[in-house]
Amino acid sequence: MKYIGLISDTHGVFDEPFREFLAPVDELWHAGDFGGGLELAKEIAAFKPLLGVAGNCDNYDLRYEHPLTRFFECEGMKVLMTHVGGYPGKYDCRARQLIDELKPDIFVC
């Protein structure tokens, strides 16, 4: 079983306390707003394998490498990840459409 570290809204900060806390995880999922551009994403990816999406504060270079939404499978579970998706009962229109279409087991936002 994979041990996943779920982070978001780092806004340019990924320093030692984060690294210590996340050291045991197998993989990191970043739900957007990396901040610091592609360089921060590369720094995080050098620390642990990374799957991420761009947030509303992320620049074009980062968005080129990390899409606004990501749909993938992890250990037999379908995962949909986006930065801003709303919450149960009040999902963003775009998120609701993707949830209805893709039927993920896990929705990360």
For every predicted segment, state its role.
Residues 18, 84, 92-94:
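A short secondary-structure junction signal
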